[in-house]
Amino acid sequence: EMFPLTLFSLGGMMIFPAADNFVTLFVALEVMSLPLYIMAATARHRRQLSYESALKYFVLGAFSSGFMLMGSAFLFGFANSLRISAVGAAIARGTNMDWMVLIGVFCVMVGLLFKVGAAPFHAWTPDVYTGAPTPVTGFMAAAVKVAAFGAMIRFYTAVAAYLQWDLLYIFAGVAVLTILVGTFAGLVQDNVKRMLAYSSIAHAGFILMGILALQKGGTGHVLFYTLGYGLATVGAFGVVALVRGRDAEGNVLGEAPSLSKWAGIGRTNPWIAGSMLVFLLSFAGIPLTGGFIGKFVVFSDAIKGGVGWLAIVGLVASAITAFYYFRLVRVMF
């Protein structure tokens, strides 16, 4: 059943960032999300943890869908249209019903922020990434996040950008909180999957920073960062799925996400360790990697967009996150 569910979810992901109608946006969100709730509960060796993570994802996902519907209703009441472009045009013309627009945009953005795992809507991310089967986790961490950020960019450029100065500090605060949570919570993790989960939260903050400071051509920069992050994430979780524990007799056991189980992999299996090293270097933004180019263009856009203080926060956090990436490298080698 995994292949049909994956195809349904992929279909929703393709429609989600392309939707120009709030009904289509919501239907695409549900088509994308409902298969994931089932897929998250399919782990065979840790069923209880998998069921718990799937239930948490489902309940919190229902709240995010509710916020998106409520925001769509407010924006429909304001513009008398369900088309996203029509709502943006109505805001550009100006009106006295600013409160409806602000509440509507805020609620829709909350629904999208949940899907990208931004703080304070990130509570599901570490548990779901840990409890779900690792291939499903990689799919969620990469494909879902790319689709959600694509939808957010479309909505922000069409609607929210007209209210940038009204909502800037709220969403800038969300970006800073997301970066800080992903950075400092990841420092204390001894489980590789949870560490990568908090890494994904920190990267969501960096991408949010780029969206808030969109410049001419900046959409391409954000999409490049998102694509580079997605490819590195798929690779990293693919490596996690290959690392297996062994018992005293040398028999191969299930996955071994515990950090202690990765000790010496660089000597016993240098290809796996070398692949993981490349992905971690990209996460850290080391020069000559796609992650470095993505961070460079996004941070440059933030400085040009008048939120240089956000870029400073991002640079400091990026240096701190490198610590737990290189801690894993030290354990492997």
What are these model-derived regions, one by one?
Residues 1-333:
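Alpha-helical transmembrane segments of multi-pass membrane proteins predominantly involved
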